[in-house]
């Protein structure tokens, strides 16, 4: 069944998918579009999710970087505003690309999936730059928490996908295909039956980054309160 769905491009039905099409449809915002740098309210916050890949194989994963914006006027809302999605990006090219994103959006957190070789990115960037790198080490339990957090955000209608121009719609259609492929197996394992899940994982990482930032702010507030007392 998984083979048929993947190669015939047949997504899971809405009863099976973690991200039903009706939920994704509600997230599409025709007034929102992909932007190339931070714009609008300077008090808006930005968060980056980065799922790196290194391989010259044509069937290899994509490197994906997703930028989410948290509007200062509505901090419960998140808006997807920028995407980098490419194959065959070598180590140095990815380092340069994430530095460009940092310069354009000044994110509060860059959440990097850091399993195996991917940890080298964090090591180099922490040594040579002041980028706000946070690493996500993926175990089965943490990956499920990562995805379920994104599911809840969609279900609460607190995440907006850009649908305002052709470029945005093309990118979001690819994201939608990946999200529809996520479900729960008969063995109780939460996973994707798709060939690629990099876009969806990068989005989930960016969302995770927003929660890490909030936890850090709370910790700082608690610390200041303790000092005052």
Describe the predicted segments one by one.
Residues 1-137, 144, 148, 152, ...:
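RNase H-like, metal-dependent nuclease domains and their acidic two-metal-ion catalytic environment used
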